[in-house]
């Protein structure tokens, strides 16, 4: 804190890491927030501070969400999974009633509100019954559990230590114990809720896969940034989806070569997972990375987002694989299907590089209703 004080003086300042897993506070900010320590906050303590900073008038927030949702529809996005700490199904139903929900939304729940979510009686993917004509676009999501931290904050829980890694052995930390994780998933199971587990390090991923195996329910691992060979093969066998964010590769490739140089060839193993039969889902993890579906597809295919050479090109997806992983593995429009369609002006199979990344939607349709049109 004192180092930041020298630059900021008595004005309260909090610098939040791009990965959101750490924050740096000066003394004035610590005093204002009522926290103690050296000013460097990691994981839950940092999340708690960010939650305090994010407090805003609900009507203002709903307006922002509506604007962002409309912008997402223009990019060709038809659905999102909301993993904010403080959101809920009722909030999104009200936004839908107010005309601020042009997307399908699955609303995740954190352990602190798990019992409340179970009491609602909605399974993951199930929409509540409303007075609105037709089915709601809002549905219950999974239980979200943060199992470890991030590479940049040096809290990702790994098999092996890394430079300045957190934890007693320098290999990162577990945000929830394996025993507690199994307990949480079993509780979610009673309410027919799946689990989406944040796991960046290979030790975290292994423990999550172990928990899925013990409990016998399906779900996803969010990020799966570094994996052992053995665990790559376990995803398909257990029916676990790998929810990955290609744009993190652009953000993390340089840091990976420094901090995880001994395991860089085991990071962002998109091709290996597909070859092993894993269901891959491409996403953004916004606001950590931009909401940029075609940019993510470009990186998944080319393993670079700029003019630098491909980073570990052996893990590149084909364009067909990347598009499939971006559309919930729906590859064709069929009678009785959900009616979610986008139209683009150029054939993506004729494009590469910035041209592919720059694609936007000329027409976005959700459930048969036009949600964005540039035609």
Where are the model-predicted features located?
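P-loop/Walker A phosphate-binding loop and immediately adjacent motor/lid segment at beta-alpha junctions
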Residues: 353-375
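A cross-family glycoside hydrolase active-site/sugar-binding cleft signature
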Residues: 16, 82-83, 104-110, 141-146, ...
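A structural motif
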Residues: 77-78, 192-193, 240
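Short amphipathic alpha-helices and their capping/turn segments at secondary-structure boundaries
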Residues: 28-37, 116-142, 227-241
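Distinct, well-ordered alpha-helical segments
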Residues: 90-95, 117-125, 205-215, 234
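Catalytic pocket of metal/acid-base enzymes, prominently hydrolases
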Residues: 1-107, 134-189, 364
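Flexible loop/turn segments at secondary-structure boundaries
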Residues: 21-23, 79-81, 87-91, 113-117, ...
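His/Asp/Glu-enriched, well-ordered alpha-helical/loop segment
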Residues: 63, 185-196, 200-219, 223-224, ...
């Amino acid at each position: 804190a004192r180092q930041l004080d020298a630059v900021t003086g008595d004005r309260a300042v909090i610098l939040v890491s791009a990965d959101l897993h750490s924050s740096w506070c000066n003394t004035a900010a610590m005093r204002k927030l009522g926290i103690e320590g050296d000013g460097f906050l990691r994981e839950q303590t940092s999340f708690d501070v960010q939650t305090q900073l994010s407090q805003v008038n609900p009507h203002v927030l709903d307006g922002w969400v509506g604007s962002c949702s409309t912008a997402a529809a223009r990019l060709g996005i038809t659905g999102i999974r909301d993993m904010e700490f403080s959101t809920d199904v009722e909030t999104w139903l009200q936004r839908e009633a107010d005309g601020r929900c042009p997307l399908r939304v699955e609303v995740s729940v954190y352990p602190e509100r798990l019992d409340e979510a179970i009491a609602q009686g909605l399974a993951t993917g199930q929409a509540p019954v409303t007075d609105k004509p037709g089915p709601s676009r809002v549905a219950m999501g999974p239980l979200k559990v943060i199992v470890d931290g991030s590479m940049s904050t040096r809290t990702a829980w790994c098999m092996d230590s890394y430079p300045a890694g957190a934890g007693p052995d320098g290999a990162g930390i577990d945000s929830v114990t394996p025993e507690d994780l199994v307990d949480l998933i079993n509780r979610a199971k009673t309410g027919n809720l799946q689990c989406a587990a944040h796991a960046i390090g290979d030790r975290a991923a292994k423990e999550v896969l172990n928990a899925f195996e013990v409990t016998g329910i399906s779900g996803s691992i969010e990020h799966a940034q570094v994996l052992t060979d053995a665990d790559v093969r376990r995803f398909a066998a257990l029916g676990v989806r790998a929810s990955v964010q290609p744009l993190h590769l652009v953000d993390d490739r340089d840091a990976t070569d420094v901090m995880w140089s001994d395991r860089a060839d085991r990071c962002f193993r998109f091709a290996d997972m597909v070859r092993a039969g894993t269901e891959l889902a491409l996403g953004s993890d916004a606001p950590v990375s931009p909401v940029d579906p075609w940019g993510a597809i470009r990186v998944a295919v080319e393993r670079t987002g700029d003019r630098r050479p491909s980073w570990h090109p052996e893990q590149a997806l084909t364009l067909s694989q990347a598009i499939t992983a971006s559309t919930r593995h729906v590859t064709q429009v069929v009678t009785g299907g959900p009616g979610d369609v986008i139209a683009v002006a150029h054939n993506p199979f004729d494009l590469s590089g910035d041209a592919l990344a720059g694609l936007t939607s000329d027409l976005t349709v959700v459930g048969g209703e036009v949600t964005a049109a540039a035609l």
